[in-house]
Curated annotation (Swiss-Prot):
Residues annotated as binding ADP: R20, A21, V22, V23, R24, R154, G185, A186, E187, K213, L214, H215
Record-level GO BP terms: canonical glycolysis; fructose 1,6-bisphosphate metabolic process; fructose 6-phosphate metabolic process
Chain positions recorded as ATP binding sites: G10, R71, D72, G101, E102, G103, T104
Binding site for substrate: T125, I126, D127, R162, M169, G170, R171, E222, R246, H252, I253, Q254, R255
EC number(s) given by UniProt: 2.7.1.11
Listed GO CC annotations: 6-phosphofructokinase complex
Active site: D127 (proton acceptor)
Cofactors required: Mg(2+)
The family this protein is said to belong to: Belongs to the phosphofructokinase type A (PFKA) family. ATP-dependent PFK group I subfamily. Prokaryotic clade 'B1' sub-subfamily.
Primary gene name: pfkA
Stated regulation of activity: Allosterically activated by ADP and other diphosphonucleosides, and allosterically inhibited by phosphoenolpyruvate.
Annotated protein name in UniProt: ATP-dependent 6-phosphofructokinase
Record GO terms (molecular function): 6-phosphofructokinase activity; ATP binding; fructose-6-phosphate binding; metal ion binding
Length: 321
């Protein structure tokens, strides 16, 4: 079998572990893997490269993706998808493994339906917001990066008795904010799912100061509001009454760096399951992980709402005294 593999959308640490596992599993059993560079863009433009076990040597500890990635809105148009399908046919690709988040998996579903070839997705996103699976590749590393940064910010916030707003990724969901906030002892976590009233934030700061706290850390998911917006609001409401107010956006630092051991191991397991499911005859779906078990889930599930750990959120509120 000739298997195509691509990574699309935002990169996630651990993608290389998935690629390595697929290539080596396939080669061991006499199958061939063709890398498609820059995601759906490469599929449209015919940017293909043969991958061997040597090509994927020494990549487990590398962040990002050796296949490169992009977001290409052209793939939403049938004329460009037909061009991509023509390229697949000319390359003799009989099956696809597609790595990415919700949007990428929606494209994978469409590809499976329109081409009839087997397509298996692997959920890879630092936001951890793909429905139908407990875990998405890249989340653990992003969480580590956020925690490391917030720990460092607390050092300087403490030294200068400041109020710090730290914005983390999470356009629609607060997974990183909740766990990073709990792990670093944030005084307040703000996420789109809970919508803590903005007007009450000055009260929380005042309450903390009365309890003897010398500094105050707010971990803010970008989907709640932007850090500068909240900084301006607090400056208007309380000024520097309780200490200087500063904001920091962690941004893409959360995406990069050496993948954690967990993302390397999970990436390897996700990759092997994706490959084995193709060989076993699966035609369409993505690799899901739930309660210690891997299985193939319907693509539709990827778009379903995935709840955050509200117990963790409430626990942080209880302990932030």
């Amino acid at each position: 079998m000739r298997i195509g593999i691509l990574t699309a959308g935002g990169d996630a640490p651990g993608m290389n572990a998935v690629i390595r596992a697929v290539v080596r599993s396939a080669e061991r059993e006499g199958h061939e893997v063709i890398g498609i560079k820059r995601g759906y863009k490469g599929l449209i433009e015919g940017d293909f490269i043969k991958l061997t076990s040597r090509d994927v040597g020494g990549i487990l500890d590398r962040g990002g993706t050796i296949l490169l990635s992009s977001r290409d809105p052209r793939y939403k148009k049938l004329e460009y998808r037909e061009k991509a399908y023509k390229n697949l046919n000319e390359q003799g690709i009989e099956a696809l493994i597609i790595l990415g988040g919700e949007g990428t998996l929606a494209g994978a579903k469409l590809t499976a339906e329109e081409t009839g070839i087997p397509v298996i997705g692997v959920p890879c996103t630092i936001d951890n917001d793909v429905g139908g699976t407990e875990y998405c590749i890249g989340y653990d590393t992003a969480l580590r990066n956020a925690v490391d940064a917030i720990d460092k910010i607390r050092d300087t916030a403490s030294s200068h008795e400041r109020i710090f707003i730290v914005e983390v990724m999470g356009r629609n969901r607060g997974f990183i904010a909740v766990e990073a906030g709990l792990a670093t002892g944030a005084e307040l976590i703000l996420i789109p799912e809970e919508r803590f009233p903005r007007e009450q934030i000055p009260e929380e700061i005042e309450k903390a100061k009365k309890l003897g706290k010398l500094h105050f850390i707010i971990v803010l998911a970008e989907g709640y509001c932007r850090a500068k917006e909240l900084e301006d609001f607090l400056l208007e409401k309380i000024g520097d009454k309780y200490g200087e107010i500063r904001s920091t956006v962690l941004g893409h630092i959360q995406r990069g760096g050496i993948p954690t051991h967990f993302d390397r191991i999970m990436g390897t397991k996700f990759g092997v399951v994706a490959y084995e499911s193709l060989i076993a005859g699966e035609r369409s779906g993505f690799v899901a992980y739930e309660k210690g078990k891997f299985y193939i889930e319907d693509f539709e599930k990827a778009q379903e709402y995935k709840p955050i750990d509200r117990e963790a959120y409430k626990l942080n509120t209880r302990l932030a005294i």
